[in-house]
Amino acid sequence: MEDFQLELVTVKDIKDVTRIEYAAYGIKTKYPSATSYKNRNYLRFYYNTNRNNYYKIMIDHQVVGTVLLCVNKHSTTLYHIALDTLYRSLGYGSKILQDLLAKSNKLRVTVPYGHVDLLHWYQRKGFTIDSIIISKYASYWKDENIINPGKAWVLTYKEKSL
């Protein structure tokens, strides 16, 4: 496996953050949670930050994903990963997570609607699911009795005992 590197990108405009975010997930249309104020938790998370540091995940000069380090007005550090599905399945995500978890044991993840495989991937990597940010159209997960649509989940990493 090639080494990955993180290239710091300082985001000056909130529109740049959301544009990168859409591109990272291949979302071509406007994110549904931005359509009304009460359902804008996802975008409001960025608006409340006082520093947005975006890291591009590079492998052999190719961007394969992004990492967003957010420090909000309450000085809570949260990490956001958007990693291409192909590279995630190849295991690059695991190495990236290990590096980030050296700084924090909590990871905030946005799961696009329908990408339940992303949630399962984090579970397999040793995260316990407390909360996650998802689209308001997440009602199909109600059967699993895991979430309330619109609530934020936080994934908390716990070392696996040997």
Name the predicted role of every residue range.
Residues 94, 114-141:
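Conserved active-site alpha-helix within GNAT-family acetyltransferase domains
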Residues 113-116, 135-162:
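C-terminal "cap" of GNAT-fold acetyltransferases
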Residues 9, 81-83, 111:
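Hydrophobic adenine-recognition pocket in adenosine-nucleotide-binding enzymes
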Residues 103-114:
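Conserved GNAT acetyl-CoA-binding A-motif
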Residues 83, 89-102, 120, 124:
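Conserved acetyl-CoA-binding loop-helix of GNAT-fold acetyltransferases
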Residues 22-44:
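Conserved GNAT-fold acetyl-CoA-binding loop/helix
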Residues 56, 62-70, 77-82:
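Conserved beta-strand in the GNAT
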Residues 3-19:
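A short beta-loop-alpha structural element at the N-terminal edge
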